[in-house]
A protein has these predicted regions:
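Generic structural signal for beta-strand residues in well-ordered domains
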Residues: 5-6, 20, 94
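S-adenosyl-L-methionine
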Residues: 14-42
């Protein structure tokens, strides 16, 4: 089910050109939040979603939404001005118990407060978030924002969330960034291995995330590599001493010149 935007169905329809049999598609053009299609087909084992970022939706202006089984478990609705977490709750609701969902997200959903923090709390406390992957900026057409991928699962082995910083996994192409196959393989390998790797990835207990006020920003947990040049203080002090000595020599020469000028004057 796609959001009620022409480009969504156009992108979906274009996939028919990628050598995939048309009988494997069931394309629906509707509103995923207020009028979803494919009710008879859910739950799904695999869900991939790139919903529009921070669009408006009915939210609590529609009294039916808070009782909708897709949204009601969180006890609160996503803000009317930012539907991001409504799309996430929709995907979670339609996900099979053994399935996996991957949703491209606007970064604000990871740290904004209010109702969105309450929804994150629901997702973390119920152990539904498997992984957060920070992507490079300038990756998608129409926005330079560094987006992220939220991976959802309903049957996880550990009560933890995996964080991957893939913000540097790209190549520059004109004014945009692009993921090469090597970049994608690196990200996938990190996700599969679920190993702590300095400046790249870390597995964080959900209790620690709760202590961080349910902030899911990757930078909160994966420390950025310090690329600043290491300065040798001894060498720096020696250079400063040379400058001070040179400055004094110049001052003496200037004073000598001034004295000679005064004599001739």
């Amino acid at each position: 089910t796609r959001s009620d935007r022409d480009w969504s169905s156009d992108v979906c329809s274009s996939d028919l050109l990628h050598d995939i049999d048309y009988d494997k598609f069931d394309i629906g053009h509707g509103d995923s939040l207020t009028g979803p299609l494919h009710w008879d087909d859910e739950p799904f084992e695999a869900i991939v979603s790139n919903p529009p970022y921070s669009i408006r939706w009915d939210g609590d202006a529609n009294p039916l939404m808070i009782n909708d089984p897709r949204f009601s478990p969180a006890g609160v609705l996503a803000p009317k001005s930012k539907a991001d977490l409504a799309f996430i709750m929709h995907s979670l609701s339609w996900l099979a118990t053994s399935g996996t969902a991957a949703i491209v997200c606007f970064p604000g959903v990871l740290y904004r407060g209010g109702a969105e923090k309450k929804i994150r709390k629901y997702l973390i406390d119920n152990n539904f978030i498997d992984c957060i992957i920070q992507l490079p900026d300038n990756l998608f057409f129409g926005t330079s924002i560094a987006t992220c991928i939220m991976v959802l699962k309903k049957s996880k082995a550990e009560n933890s969330t995996f964080f991957i910083d893939a913000s540097k996994e790209c190549i520059k192409v004109t004014n945009s960034n692009k993921l090469t196959q090597k970049n994608m393989d690196t990200i996938i390998d990190a996700y599969k291995n679920r190993a702590n790797d300095d400046h790249v990835s870390i597995l964080v207990p959900n209790s620690d995330i709760a202590e961080q006020d349910y902030n899911l920003s990757v930078s909160t947990y994966v420390e950025q590599k310090d690329t600043r040049e290491i300065i040798d203080i001894t060498v720096l002090n020696a250079e400063i001493e040379k400058i001070v000595v040179r400055e004094q020599i110049l001052r003496n020469e200037i004073n000598k010149i001034i004295s000679e000028i005064e004599v001739y004057a």
